């Protein structure tokens, strides 16, 4: 039987899951809405902008599986920490290869290194919500997986509301590269909070929990793709 779970109970079960969902919602909404704006401001051609968005999505999708395999073998919080700080590092390098600060010998002018760092950033960042969901499931029973997933996606949606606005403020204050500065700061916030949670709470092994790649939508529909959750019983129709 599927049990309900309040947001307060969800936060008590996994503070990292709730806080990270809000922060990551902010990150991903800004990433997918303003990446094309950033590329256009950096004088990328229409083809380059299309290629950038394609490479972002496909590399993030491919990385779901190796990241998920690793997270099932080690403490998921460590994987979250390495992923967030890794994404921050690659975002930092992307600043210096985006078109205004070319690398030596003109390598940056071909934008090869920008694509390279963007793909590396995507492979670290885009599996994050699935990691957060799997980490949260480590601390709850199987009959609450659906409710927890819905709660995390609600928290993700709250963050997604403010992401584009906050990122645009960074771009106004810092310039075009404020886009990546924003991503660096918010990824580091998740990583720092994960380090803090590791120090005050030991890891737990839950045999019912495993990494499942799910879409980072703001509705609970994605949870239906999770094979570890049991189907929700539909109410009987009144004749």
List where the protein language model places each region.
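Helix-loop boundary and gating motifs at the non-cytosolic
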Residues: 17, 28-42, 48-49
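Helix-to-loop junctions at the C-terminal end of transmembrane segments
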Residues: 63-75, 171-172
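Structural signature of the two symmetry-related core transmembrane helices
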Residues: 78-93, 184
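Intracellular juxtamembrane helix-capping segments at the cytosolic ends
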Residues: 126-140
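A membrane-interface helix-boundary motif in multi-pass transporters
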Residues: 169-187
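Intrinsic disorder in cytosolic terminal tails and internal cytosolic loops
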Residues: 197-239
């Amino acid at each position: 039987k599927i049990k309900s779970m309040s947001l307060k109970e969800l936060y008590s079960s996994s503070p990292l899951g709730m806080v990270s969902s809000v922060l990551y919602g902010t990150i991903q909404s800004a990433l997918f809405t303003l990446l094309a704006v950033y590329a256009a401001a950096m004088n990328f051609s229409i083809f380059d902008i299309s290629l950038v968005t394609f490479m972002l999505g496909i590399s993030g999708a491919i990385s779901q599986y190796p990241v998920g395999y690793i997270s099932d073998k080690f403490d998921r919080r460590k994987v979250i920490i390495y992923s967030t700080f890794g994404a921050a590092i690659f975002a930092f390098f992307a600043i210096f290869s985006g078109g205004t600060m070319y690398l030596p010998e003109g390598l940056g002018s071909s934008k090869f290194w920008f694509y390279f760092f963007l793909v590396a950033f995507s492979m670290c960042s885009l599996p994050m919500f699935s990691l957060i969901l799997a980490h949260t499931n480590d601390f709850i029973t199987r009959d609450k997986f659906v409710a927890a997933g819905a709660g995390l996606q609600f928290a993700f949606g709250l963050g997604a509301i403010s992401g584009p606005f906050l990122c645009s403020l960074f771009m106004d204050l810092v310039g075009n590269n404020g886009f990546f500065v924003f991503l660096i700061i918010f990824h580091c916030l998740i990583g720092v909070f994960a380090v803090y949670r590791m120090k005050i709470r030991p890891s737990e092994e839950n045999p019912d929990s495993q990494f499942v790649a799910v879409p980072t939508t703001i509705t609970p529909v994605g949870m239906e793709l999770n094979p570890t959750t049991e189907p929700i019983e539909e109410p009987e129709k009144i004749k």
